[in-house]
Amino acid sequence: MIGERPRGIRAVLTSGALLLVALLWLGPYAWMTLTSLKTLPEIVAAPAYPLPQSVQLGAYREVLKAVPVLRYLANTIVMAVAIAALQIALALPAGYALAKLHFAGKRAAFTLVLACLLIPAQVTFVPIFTMLGAAGLVNTFGALILPFAVSAFGTFLVRQALLNVPDELIEAARMDGASELRIIYGLLAPMLRPTLASFFLFSFIFHYNDYFWPLVMTTDDRVRTLPLAIALLREQGTGVRWHVVMAGNVILSLPVLALFAAAQRQILRAVTARAI
């Protein structure tokens, strides 16, 4: 009993510290949401009050009127999902080759993958833009998706996960007549579901929030993305209407929150599997 009391106190302190960190992370999002429900005079008033005097949804109506939000949102989701799906589809065979196959230059190939992680995207911007322009892909979804179809990080992640898979399992599948592609997508992919779900979420959020590349490659509303719409909200009028900007950011964040809520179980499985 004496030894259980310090352990219980430690658990309470740990939970309290984690709760404090969670509140610090949620604080900015809560402030953004509350600001979107205020009027502009309430926002600029001094001293500022965190809660609105009365809930106002006018900022959300202004967002929907000012920019084609639904079209931009659909474009953003299509782009982010397509990129994440392509990256997973290509990272699986690449990671499998680096983890389970034996060929000359395997170590050099893995070193090259690691080196690609160190290359800033800005370095490759000009040559990729030139190639896409020459191919006539500007203002198309191809220009937004194809440059990111291959992920060095995804390849590294899959390779590391496959190192924990017994070689005997793969040999047994080969003896049963399974092809390499059947082994990769039919046997190994379901086993790596937590890892792939974590990577899908990471890739989706990264490209969903991407501002620079869609800004450069698109000028047509048919393919523009939602982060560009948020920037347009800042530029309208003589001053920044912060309640409208915050409302746009709340709309922008909703699909990501929904995706995280749907995938959190797989993410926890991936984290616990790494811990074990």
Residue ranges and their predicted role:
Residues 1-3:
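N-terminal hydrophobic targeting signals that begin at the initiator methionine
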Residues 7-276:
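A structural signal for multi-pass alpha-helical bundles of membrane permease subunits
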